């Protein structure tokens, strides 16, 4: 209830988020559970993978357009978020390669943001997640993508 009410009052672009599908790449169960709950209350569907390799594999195997965006943790086992992003950006299917990817990480310094952008990510959100910032970032990235 709080998330829905907050979205309506804040004008963060809830209409643009409703019904979207996001692939969540997060190895920490608690972080994933919190993020999924926030997104679900905002009308966003999520599917979760637990490492960078699973994320790349999921994007490769699913049809382009299955997901509107990826929320990508940086520090994950097997393949970190930067390497997973770079692998996705190199995919031969350009519709899959250009999916918006947002870093979602405890690394909140300016250099971390620059590294995320340099890896090919479209944005950066710091943990712990702040509702306003997350929803605003998602709406902004979706708007930018629709204007491509």
State what each model feature region is.
Residues 1-148:
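C-terminal compact regulatory domains
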């Amino acid at each position: 209830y709080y998330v829905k009410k907050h979205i309506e009052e804040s004008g963060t672009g809830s209409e643009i988020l409703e019904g979207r599908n996001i692939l969540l790449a997060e190895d920490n169960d608690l972080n994933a559970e919190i993020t999924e709950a926030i997104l679900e209350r905002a009308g966003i569907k999520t599917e979760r993978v637990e490492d960078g390799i699973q994320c790349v594999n999921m994007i490769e195997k699913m049809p382009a357009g299955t997901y509107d965006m990826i929320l990508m943790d940086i520090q994950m086992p097997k393949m970190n978020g930067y390497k997973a992003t770079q692998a996705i950006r190199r995919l031969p299917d350009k519709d899959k390669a250009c999916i918006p990817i947002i870093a979602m990480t405890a690394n909140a310094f300016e250099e971390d943001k620059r590294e995320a952008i340099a890896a090919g990510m479209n944005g950066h959100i710091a943990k712990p997640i702040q509702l306003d910032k997350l929803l605003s970032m998602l709406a902004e990235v979706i708007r930018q993508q629709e204007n491509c």
